[in-house]
Amino acid sequence: MSIVFEKPKALTDAPLHYCPGCTHGIIHRLVAEAIDALGIEGRTIGIASVGCSVMAYDYFTCDCVQAPHGRAPAVATGVKRACPENIVFTYQGDGDLAAIGTAETVHAAARRENITVIFVN
């Protein structure tokens, strides 16, 4: 019998704390699969803010940094400038990114910062 699906290496074995039916677990798996497929686990840094994404450091095997509410793009900018060889991504919910964090997101885009922003609604 062949294995059809296995857990991505970029995900830990920690049980998810999200509510039943929430898509965060699926999105975590997709992010981890991308990290595995690109072979960037050892040089990836995730930035998570408050809200549901706050525990991302428990679920990804890459380095993770906590950011204040809405400030993940600003923190990601600082991390990327300090470590330009690393892949830096933010993992943010709608209240964090599209409400209090709108300015940081827009300005990071306007400056063409080399970060990836994952917007979870």
Regions picked out by a protein language model, each given a short descriptive name:
Residues 3, 8-68:
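Active-site diphosphate/adenylate-binding microenvironment
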Residues 52-121:
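Thiamine diphosphate
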